[in-house]
């Protein structure tokens, strides 16, 4: 099923709007930045394909939360937080040490309310320049 260019442009405009988080709904203890037992955010680059241009090799980016005490020798569950149309790896705000997602993860793990796990926010665009001005948004679908 095809999508009109107008529908796609409208979806992108809506997606690019500012996301408002009602921080009052998040208990204060989960919003605190941990000085001890804090995980880290790593920004990575990885090889992928441009699925609109016959599989051309491209490089994509992702942000990865690694819990405090992370070890390559241990197995972890992984949560992939995907963005919507027009978004990218930064859409969830998990871009630095002050990220609300990071602070919540650190505290949920610290208070032993969840087991440590990895969070990945990848760039799920199907093309190299999917959300850049002048690109073919139909290739997103």
PLM features: residue spans?
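Non-catalytic cap/lid and distal C-terminal segments of serine-dependent acyl enzymes
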Residues: 1-141
């Amino acid at each position: 099923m095809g999508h009109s260019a107008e529908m796609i442009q409208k979806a992108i405009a809506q997606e690019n709007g500012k996301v408002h988080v009602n921080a009052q709904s998040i208990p204060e203890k989960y919003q605190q930045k941990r000085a001890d037992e804090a995980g880290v955010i790593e920004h990575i680059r990885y090889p992928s394909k441009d699925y609109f241009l016959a599989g051309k090799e491209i490089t994509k980016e992702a942000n990865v939360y690694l819990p405090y005490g992370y070890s390559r020798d241990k197995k972890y569950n992984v949560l992939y937080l995907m963005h919507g149309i027009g978004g990218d790896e930064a859409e969830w705000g998990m871009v630095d040490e002050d990220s609300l997602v990071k602070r919540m993860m650190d505290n949920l793990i610290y208070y032993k309310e969840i087991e440590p796990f990895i969070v990945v926010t990848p760039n799920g665009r199907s093309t190299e320049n999917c959300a850049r001005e002048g690109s073919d948004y139909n290739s997103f679908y």
